[in-house]
Every structure is written in C-alpha cells, then in structure tokens.
Amino acid sequence: MACLASRVQYGQGITPELLGRIERAEYVLKDMGFAQCRVRDHGSLGRIEVPADRIAAVVERRERIVAAMEALGYTYVTLDLRGFRSGSMNEEVRRP
C-alpha cells in the first residue's frame, strides 16, 4: 500500500491525526467492498477514487459513504470520475 502521506494535498500539513482520518476513510470503503480505493485529502474535501468499473457501486452506496466521511470530518465528499490512478495528487503539480 502506498504511503498515506501521498493522499494529502500539496502544501497541507501532515499530522498523525490527518493520516488517521485518511486511513479510517479508506477502511470504511474497503469494509463496503471496495478493495482498491484511495481517499485524497483536500482539507475539508475528501476525494474518493475507485476503479472506473466500480464507480456505479459507490453511487449506489452514496448515503452511507457520505455519512461515514462526514463523521470523519469531511464537509465535502466527492467521487473522482476518472477513477483510481496512482499519483493523482501529482497531476496538479505537473501542470504548466
């Protein structure tokens, strides 16, 4: 598994509490059957990534996922429609 710090937005401070929140958020998704998933932390926004063929399943569980993510402190819960991909936090940094 990739380092949890790779899920944190650039410029955001990394704390044990923040890493714990990300770990718990991903555990929630895994417990719902999403073996491959990432929660990218953008402060108050949690961006969920799952493989493209599992996106519909996230939408089906939307209410449960939102409730769990809000309980972890996320105000906004989003689903990345591009699906799971390694290194997605680097995409913004690579832009000219």
Label the predicted regions.
Residues 1-96:
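Nucleotide-activated chemistry modules centered on ATP-dependent adenylation/adenylyltransferase
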